[in-house]
Regions:
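Conserved lysine of the Walker
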Residues: 126
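Accessory nucleic acid-recognition modules appended to NTPase machines
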Residues: 293-501
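Sensor-1/coupling segment of RecA-like P-loop NTPase cores
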Residues: 195-217
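Domain-level recognition of nuclease-like catalytic cores that cleave nucleotide substrates
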Residues: 549-578
């Protein structure tokens, strides 16, 4: 018996559906009831997909090798029917990211003539989101769904050809993955919205060159696209989706949805090793920027970065910025001889450690440390640069890193000089920062001074350095996630001539604020809240920002209250932001 198909007849002005098929050499037909039409259409489409698979089956080394469709039909890799089931099955047990709801609403919502752009840096869960959505589809929807995989060998004309074929066959839901690999995507992206979305297709575009999507929105898509970001991964998602609990684990590995958590599998995290972090910076960030600039305006928009790109020094500049991301993004960061800001801070803190003061780091050969860091991070110092790094380079690199959602500025307000504009640049991927810190520790361990002191003292010094780094990073994480979760508030650090409030949450409309100290400690001690209880600081703050509604210490211990100070557990605080 043949698969058959649906035809329609008009009788007395009314349209009726009929199922026609061939059986024993004879054509047969029957009327299809309205309530069974959708299910029957799905069964027919599924049977057709299976038939195509059988026709395209080849034998190689005794094993069956399947292609999604005959090579003569599609020019890209198109998956439909049974292949979609195989494609989505491996992620059925995975927990979903919060942005899954927006993807679901677009696919199943009313047609609005727009495409959805799912973009973000590598390993932030874009393809997994698509596979999860396809995996939850019923048979009727899946029969009208196709997943299109493209690469650098394909062109926009190839994708256009395949989308027309899919449209003619009744496919409605099309996911195009790695679409930014198309060299002509940025200049021709309007094809997806102006031709296919307006025709009733739901088009989801995804890719790792997120900068390319930003360019295409400006050049081609305008208001005909919905942008769905995946790069920013807050702690609450890291814990819930990956099943990895604890702020220190987030500091070490946060920033990607690499399948390293208990809810995924036991593969290594992206930032578990220095090499992994370096590879990520090179492929997900530097090459992202390079590829997008190469394709944007036919390579005519490199601006001041042209020389850096041509001489292979863009990765060098980005690495330098990431290493010193906690400090002002100034020309000095890019042009000075490489030196570790983390080491300078740790030297000072170790000298004034109340329990175990030591000047061991004063004896460390700082040049040797810098050289080891240079070797590990593969960063050329200024003398090795074949092109001068100027202020224009700094500005443009910072712009692109912000477009990639990789960095975010947090205001730093000086109470003594309110007109002074300052900010701290926070990295959205803490694991990348921590990987560089571990490289610093390796450099210290190789210094001769450390070989001359006891292993107990040596380990204590190293532990203190890493604790200082984690403390600074925890502060940044709290600031960033609070800013992202509370866009109706102003989030900033407030500095005084002596001391500071680590975070102020200012409600300008209601003339009130909250003040915070952020400590990496797991113990509540009086010294943590001395600034919060400073009457002069609080009076100046209330004069400028209104009534103080709450005083808080965010730390790693249990939530509790001591007098007028609320102690908040950091993991609980970050999860409550959702």
């Amino acid at each position: 018996m043949s698969i058959g198909g649906i035809t329609y007849k008009k009788i007395n002005g009314k349209r009726y559906a009929y199922y026609q098929w061939c059986e024993d050499g004879k054509q047969r037909s029957r009327r299809v009831k309205d309530d069974e039409l959708e299910s029957l259409v799905a069964q027919i489409e599924l049977a057709k997909s299976q038939a195509v698979l059988e026709r395209s089956m080849e034998l190689s080394d005794g094993r069956a090798v399947y292609s999604a469709q005959p090579l003569s039909v599609f020019k890209t890799d198109v998956k439909t029917g049974v292949l979609l089931e195989n494609f989505s099955d491996p992620v059925k047990g995975f927990k979903k990211r919060e942005c899954f709801a927006a993807l679901h609403d677009y696919v199943y919502g009313a047609n609005n003539d727009r495409v959805l752009v799912l973009y973000g840096l590598r390993r932030t869960g874009k393809t997994t989101l698509v596979r999860q959505l396809i995996g939850e589809m019923d048979a009727a929807h899946r029969a009208k769904t196709a997943f299109v995989q493209v690469n650098t060998r394909h062109t926009l004309a190839d994708v256009n050809h395949d989308l027309k074929l899919l449209e003619s066959q009744g496919f409605k839901y099309v996911f195009v993955d790695e679409v930014t690999q198309l060299g002509d995507f940025i200049e021709g992206a309007a094809l997806f919205s102006d031709v296919f979305a307006v025709g009733g297709m739901k088009i989801v575009l995804s890719g790792t060159d997120s900068l390319g999507f930003v360019f295409s929105e400006d050049e081609q898509l305008y208001d005909r696209c919905i942008l769905l970001h995946t790069t920013f991964i807050p702690y609450r998602e890291f814990e819930r989706v990956l099943g990895v609990v604890g702020i220190d684990e987030f500091i070490r590995y946060g920033g990607t949805m690499s399948m390293g958590g208990t809810n995924y599998n036991k593969d290594a995290f992206t930032f578990a090793t220095k090499k992994g972090a370096d590879d990520y910076v090179d492929s997900a960030i530097a090459r992202n920027i390079q590829h997008s600039l190469k394709c944007y305006q036919y390579g005519g928009h490199f601006r001041s970065l042209q020389q850096l790109y041509e001489r292979g020094e863009l990765t060098n500049a980005i690495n330098r910025i990431v290493e010193d991301i906690n400090h002002r993004f100034t020309l000095d960061v890019l042009t000075r001889d490489f030196a570790s800001s983390d080491l300078k801070i740790s030297v000072s803190n170790l000298r004034r450690d109340r329990m175990h003061p030591t000047d061991a780091l004063d004896k460390v050969n700082a040049v040797a440390v810098a050289q080891e860091m240079k070797r590990l991070l593969e960063i050329m110092d200024r003398n090795e640069c074949s092109v001068d790094i100027e202020d224009a380079h700094r500005v443009e690199i910072r712009e692109y890193l912000q477009m990639l959602d990789m960095i975010c500025p947090i205001d730093v307000v000086n109470m003594a000089s309110l007109n002074q504009n300052a900010f701290r640049t926070v990295l959205a991927q803490p694991g990348l920062r921590y990987a560089q810190s571990e490289a610093l520790v390796r450099g210290l361990m190789m210094d001769e001074v450390f070989q001359k002191i006891s292993i107990g003292e040596r380990n204590r010094i190293i532990a203190r350095i890493l604790d200082e780094i984690r403390g600074r990073m925890m502060e940044e994480i709290v600031l960033l996630e609070t800013k992202m979760a509370r866009p109706d508030r102003q989030i900033f650090t407030l500095q005084f001539p002596v001391g500071e409030f680590d975070m102020v949450v200012f409600d300008s409309e209601n003339a009130c604020c909250e003040i915070y100290e952020i400590k990496h400690s797991d113990k509540a001690v009086p010294a943590q809240c001395r600034h919060l209880q400073d009457k002069k600081k609080c009076h100046e703050t209330e004069f400028r920002y209104g009534k103080i509604k709450g005083r808080y210490v965010i730390y790693r211990g249990k939530s509790c209250r001591q007098d007028d100070i609320e102690y908040l557990n950091v993991e609980e605080y970050l999860k409550d932001l959702g």
